[in-house]
Each structure stands twice: as C-alpha cells, then as structure tokens.
C-alpha cells in the first residue's frame, strides 16, 4: 500500500506522531512517503504558506497514492490536490478552538466556518481524543474514528540512567499561551522546589531532564492528548496537569496523576508541593502511570489497529 503523509513539520506534536506512524508502517511493509513543503518561518505565515506551497506541489506532481493522509486542518488544503484513491484527515485538538486561544474570537469564527467545510474533504476523519471526537460531533455533526497515538517505548532504551534531582519540577513543551507556561511561572514563587523549563530541546535531552525530575507539570489552557504525559508515565515521573481537553482521558485524578483547574496558579502550586512532600503518594502515582501506558499505549498494543484502519480504508 502506497501512502502519503502530509504535515507542516515532522519534529513534534501531530507531525511527530505522523513520523512515528510512518516508521512503524514501513517496518510492516507499507510504502509511506512524508511530504516536505517549504514555508515562510514567520508565526502567522507558517500555516498559510505551507497550504499554498503544498497545494502547488501536489497539483504539479504526477505521483499517485492509495491513501493521502493529512495531519491537522492546514494540511487538508494540500491533501485536496493529491492524487489518491482515499483521503484521511487526523486532528489532535479542535483547530478553531486552538486559533481562538492564540488569536481572536473573530479570527476563530472565520476559521470555524472554513473548518466545517474542510472536514468534508476527507473520506475518513481520525483523532486521538474522545473529547475532540465529541466536540466535533456536537459542533458539525461529523464522525471521527478514535485512534490513540502510541508511545514508542523502544526509543527510551537510548535514554541513559540519570541521578534523580529531588524537588525538580519540569515543564516540557512550547513557550506559548495555550500551553500555560505563564501560569506555572506565576506559581513558581510558591513552589518548594526548582522549576526547569524545556521549551526547545532535542527529544533525548528533554527526556534526560524529565527522567531526573520529581514532577512533570502540564499547565495547559487547551490540549488534546499530550505525548509528554505518556513519556512521563513510562519514566515513572508523576504528573500534575490541568483538567482540559483530552488530559482526563489519560489521568484519573489521584490514581495515576493529579488534575487541577486551568489558570489557577495557587491550586497548581499546592498540588506540586503536595507531591514533592508526600513520597508515598508520588511513588503510587508514578507506578500507576507506568502500568497505564504499558497496558494501553504501546505500539505492540495499538499497531494492529493502525494496520487494520488503512486496510479497511481501501475496502470501502
């Protein structure tokens, strides 16, 4: 089966997920190509330039595919012009809500109208979050297939053993409004530990810091299913996160993590301090997180579902 994956980049977020899926599918005999498109490296021009240049590249290409799979809404503008028997669009969050968090309500309203149309271009829609699945169904009446994004646990064998830094609290993610990094910074003076911010590190370096930390904090205002939570689970690092988006699909409060309201620095600081001081609770949560990810989110568990998804797609 010949598949084209389309994403603005393949180094993180949904694009990183696309690269990981491609790698695993290739290992099982699929012919998967990643489409690389130049774009203007300016914040508000990245997605529009990607959509324009990518669409031109697709129109000029004579190559055909069994499946064209777009990752996130801007990639669908490119997918539309790819010569393929079937098309798929995957999202890791409600795109118009993400735009509203970063820009304005007016911009989001315009995007929302376009979004409802774009979703109709794909033969199949997928998401890794039941929360996102539910929102799109209620908002536009469209059906998404739910597919968890797996964690490639084999790659953690490259992460060396590190000394645990007691009291170290880590944030791993983009330095952007929706990630809530400013909320953690507001809480920082009340935290009885050292906060380390990893906003632009290579994956291995970020994982070394995560592995050495006592707590991972995910203070997001808006989220789908953060990959870093799964990574912390596997490394047995307890997680404190906001109860937004798909995060409660990973974390059961008090069992394999701690959930706090978004935009509440005081509650966030209190939760962090509790985990730092209660070693038994911290250990219990870390062990439960590890059990959850190993039982539910590895490629060994989920790859058969991905293979079946693509095979069934060509049967319809």
Describe each PLM feature range.
Residues 56, 107-125:
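Membrane-proximal helix-turn-helix segments that form the acceptor-binding/catalytic region
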Residues 67-69, 82-100, 126:
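Active-site proximal beta-strand in glycosyltransferases
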Residues 131, 150:
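Carbohydrate-associated surface elements
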Residues 162-179, 185-188:
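Conserved donor-binding/catalytic core segment of Leloir-type glycosyltransferases
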Residues 221:
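Aromatic "clamp/platform" in nucleotide-sugar-dependent glycosyltransferases that forms part
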Residues 253-254, 258-265, 274-279:
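Conserved acidic donor-binding segment of nucleotide-sugar-dependent glycosyltransferases
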